[in-house]
């Protein structure tokens, strides 16, 4: 059973990491800024993983744009998602730029032989420390319009879309990287606002995966959504009819600590309905989980999980140099970089 996504410690693949990646529980890999020096180095690292690990691995990254962009030097400066509606007055231009950003991000990552970037963020509003300008908008209708275009751009390249952080991380001030946030709003309000983007995009068949939040919604359930069968099985699967893959958010984050030690976090998230579990920045915990985590599942559930995983691999391979010579890439690079520069200037002025 392959369910874990783990990470690497540096810019080179070590022998002990090859052994971890070949463990039967490991389904994939997530890359971070510490794994990146320049384009040639990251291409070599990914090529090493593909060649030396003797099984298919889902290689992933957080390359959303704005402040969450793991690879920078030599890549397009993707604008923060908030910038589209904030800086561009024409709705058609907003949507066009969102499409360009989704296409550009997916094209650059696919050219590196990366399968998936965990995007887009579907959280409403900008007040949450962990979300901020990663959110498209504070109003669900506008957010849905822009997210649709971003995803359509990704899909043009053949990359799957992951909506996060279900059912919505935008209305808590605390950062789940550092603590477990609590959202005390009424259930009716969450369903009337935060869930709408997920609901709409699922109905349109635009989400291939969903990542739940490490947030406790106190008026709905006493567990974080990432470890809650109410949110994942009852709401996401049954009420919204979602049939794609469910990723846990990083179980190494402090926000997941509510569920116990690392093995307990994996156990609870899996039982709650997650298909794939991320465990990052905790190398000792990875070894502990691989040694002690013994998930029990029926053959049918394993087949369903593997089918969902298989659908997330990239649909095509793009040559890096060919991409950079394309007219579309060059035009997008110029426009998106300019918008991000305008956004940084705007934020500096605003502060």
Swiss-Prot record:
Active-site residues from the entry? 177 (proton donor/acceptor), 249 (nucleophile)
State the family named in the UniProt similarity comment for this chain: Belongs to the glycosyl hydrolase 3 family. NagZ subfamily.
Q: In which pathway does it act?
A: Cell wall biogenesis; peptidoglycan recycling
Task: Report the principal subcellular site.
Answer: cytoplasm
Q: Which PANTHER family match?
A: BETA-HEXOSAMINIDASE, BETA-HEXOSAMINIDASE-RELATED
**Its catalytic activity?**
Hydrolysis of terminal non-reducing N-acetyl-D-hexosamine residues in N-acetyl-beta-D-hexosaminides
**Function of the protein:** Plays a role in peptidoglycan recycling by cleaving the terminal beta-1,4-linked N-acetylglucosamine (GlcNAc) from peptide-linked peptidoglycan fragments, giving rise to free GlcNAc, anhydro-N-acetylmuramic acid and anhydro-N-acetylmuramic acid-linked peptides.
GO molecular function annotations of the record: beta-N-acetylhexosaminidase activity
Q: What is this protein called?
A: Beta-hexosaminidase
Which Enzyme Commission number(s) are on file for it?
Answer: 3.2.1.52
Q: Where in the cell is it found?
A: Cytoplasm
InterPro entries with a match to the protein in the record: Beta_hexosaminidase_bac (IPR022956), Glyco_hydro_3_N (IPR001764), Glyco_hydro_3_N_sf (IPR036962), Glycoside_hydrolase_SF (IPR017853), NagZ_Beta-hexosaminidase (IPR050226)
Q: Which GO terms describe its biological process?
A: carbohydrate metabolic process; cell division; cell wall organization; peptidoglycan biosynthetic process; peptidoglycan turnover; regulation of cell shape
User: Mind telling me which GO cellular component terms the entry cites?
Assistant: cytoplasm
Residues where substrate binds: 62, 70, 134, 164-165
Keyword terms of this UniProt record? Cell cycle, Cell division, Cell shape, Cell wall biogenesis/degradation, Cytoplasm, Glycosidase, Hydrolase, Peptidoglycan synthesis
Q: Which organism is it from?
A: Histophilus somni (strain 129Pt) (Haemophilus somnus)
Cited Gene3D superfamilies:
Glycoside hydrolase, family 3, N-terminal domain
Site positions (Important for catalytic activity) are: 175
């Amino acid at each position: 059973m392959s369910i874990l996504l783990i990470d690497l410690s540096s810019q080179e693949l070590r022998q002990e990491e090859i052994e971890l990646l070949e463990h039967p529980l490991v389904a994939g890999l997530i890359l971070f800024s510490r794994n990146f020096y320049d384009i040639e180095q990251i291409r070599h690292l990914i090529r090493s993983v593909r060649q030396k690990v003797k099984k298919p691995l889902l290689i992933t990254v957080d390359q959303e744009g704005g402040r969450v962009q793991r690879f920078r030097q030599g890549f397009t400066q993707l604008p923060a998602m908030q910038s589209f509606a904030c800086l561009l007055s024409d709705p058609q231009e907003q949507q066009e730029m969102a499409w360009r950003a989704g296409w550009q991000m997916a094209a650059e990552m696919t050219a590196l032989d990366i399968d998936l970037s965990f995007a887009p963020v579907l959280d409403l509003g900008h007040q949450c420390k962990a979300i901020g300008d990663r959110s498209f908008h504070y109003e669900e209708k506008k957010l849905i319009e822009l997210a649709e275009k971003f995803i359509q751009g990704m899909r043009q390249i053949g990359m799957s879309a992951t909506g996060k952080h279900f059912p919505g991380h935008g209305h808590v001030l605390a950062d789940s990287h550092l603590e477990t946030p609590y959202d005390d709003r009424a259930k009716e309000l969450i369903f009337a606002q935060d869930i709408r983007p997920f609901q709409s995009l699922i109905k349109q068949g635009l989400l291939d995966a969903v990542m739940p939040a490490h947030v406790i919604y106190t008026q709905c359930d006493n567990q974080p959504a990432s470890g809650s069968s109410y949110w994942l099985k009852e709401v996401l699967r049954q009420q919204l009819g979602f049939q794609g893959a469910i990723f846990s958010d990083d179980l190494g984050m402090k926000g997941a600590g509510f569920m116990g030690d690392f093995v307990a976090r994996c156990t609870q998230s899996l039982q709650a309905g997650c298909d794939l579990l991320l465990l990052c920045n905790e190398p000792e915990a990875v070894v502990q989980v691989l040694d002690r985590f013994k998930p029990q599942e029926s053959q049918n559930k394993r087949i369903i999980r593997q089918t969902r995983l298989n659908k997330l691999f990239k649909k095509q391979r793009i040559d890096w140099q060919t991409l950079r010579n394309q007219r579309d890439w060059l035009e997008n690079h110029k426009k998106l970089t300019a918008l991000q520069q305008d956004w940084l200037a705007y934020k500096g002025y605003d502060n």
